[in-house]
Amino acid sequence: MNKIISVWKKMNLIRKIGIGVVLGVLLGLIAPKITVIALFGSLFVGALKAIAPLLVLTLVAHALSQAPAGQKSNMRTVICLYLFGTFAAAFIAVGASYLFPIKLVLSTTTTTDITPPQGIAEVFQDLLLKVVDNPINALATANYIGVLTWAAVFGLAFRHASKTTKDLLQSTAEVISKVVGWIIGLAPFGIMGLVFDTIANNGLTALKDYGLLLLLLVGSMIFVALVVNPLIAFLVMKKNPYPLVFECLRVSGVTAFFTRSSAANIPVNMQLCKRLGVDPDTYSVSIPLGATINMAGAAITINILTMAAVHTLGISVDFSSALLLSVVASLSAAGASGVAGGSLLLIPVACSLFGIPNELAMQVVGVGFVVGVIQDSCEAALNSSTDVLFTVVAERSAWKK
């Protein structure tokens, strides 16, 4: 027994996660009624979501408190990469829908009664209201826009504090980072529970009737992850991007695939950025910001399902409308930040561009929930891994200057 524990301790995290995945699948197929196994997954995701807002608040506040006025930052480059990458993904999704048009079977019933935003203006309004949220409420509800805003305010104020106060802030950030490390160490057990829950509840046939739609969604995300993002990275870094791309997918993408949340994966991404040599002043802001605005996977989901509805209803879409859809999907995708399945609720916003009634749009959302078992996981993996990729790309681009 001691030998097994010793081997387990020496094994790297990715291999441990792989073992967790295999065990989760086997247990889900063999013993689906032992539902207590799923509790490991719920506890793991809950722990990550609980610690992530505190981690963001302390790291951002500490980074800004230590940064002297006028210090150079790569944030402008990172933000530009986030926005351009999301738009490029949205446009690729429209192109894929033109090449492989898919029609949906829409009924008169819906699978969800959640009220989506009524327009792009409402999405922007919600984001602005999040900025001025009560800081305690922002932490409690994982409102990362609010957390980032207050962390920036506190960090700037701490610049004028005494050295003792700054040291206390640094110690607090280090303590929370240590706790995050402990939680991430439990990832194999948590992911085993998440995989078990998915297999036990849905089996291997849950997505059979929506195979083509799922194939288009996942195929577009893979194309963006392995072609579009590396191309953007190459144009910025002027060097082979694939070793970095695969590292981001291997570490960040795999974990996010199972947590199904960019927000829950923030601690994992921050540790990866640290290991890749990124300036803490950059990644402590860019990673939580990316979990909010860098939503390539969400933009793909919104566009492909909207275009499927358009094809189903026989609506003609010209190039300018497709371009507008890509812009709206890119901007709306920010409203899906950190929420498992959140992108589906933005589909009615895009459908409204083509005069599709909200009742029908919500049926499309219902279809999305059916394929969401895998779609949401792939979406989170793309979103989260791209956060790290573009942060590192901006950093390495700055090294050359």
UniProtKB/Swiss-Prot annotation:
Transmembrane segments: 17-37, 40-60, 78-98, 138-158, 179-199, 212-232, 295-315, 336-356
InterPro entries: Na-dicarboxylate_symporter (IPR001991), Na:dicarbo_symporter_sf (IPR036458), Ser_Thr_transp_SstT (IPR023025)
CC annotations in GO: plasma membrane
An annotated Gene Ontology molecular function: neutral L-amino acid:sodium symporter activity
SUPFAM superfamilies from the UniProt entry: Proton glutamate symport protein
GO annotation terms (biological process): serine transport; threonine transport
Catalytic reaction list: L-serine(in) + Na(+)(in) = L-serine(out) + Na(+)(out); L-threonine(in) + Na(+)(in) = L-threonine(out) + Na(+)(out)
Subcellular location: Cell membrane
Membrane disposition: Multi-pass membrane protein
UniProt keyword annotations, A-Z: Amino-acid transport, Cell membrane, Membrane, Symport, Transmembrane, Transmembrane helix, Transport
Origin superkingdom: Bacteria
Function statement: Involved in the import of serine and threonine into the cell, with the concomitant import of sodium (symport system).
Family designation: Belongs to the dicarboxylate/amino acid:cation symporter (DAACS) (TC 2.A.23) family.
The protein, known as: Serine/threonine transporter SstT
Organism of derivation: Streptococcus suis (strain 98HAH33)
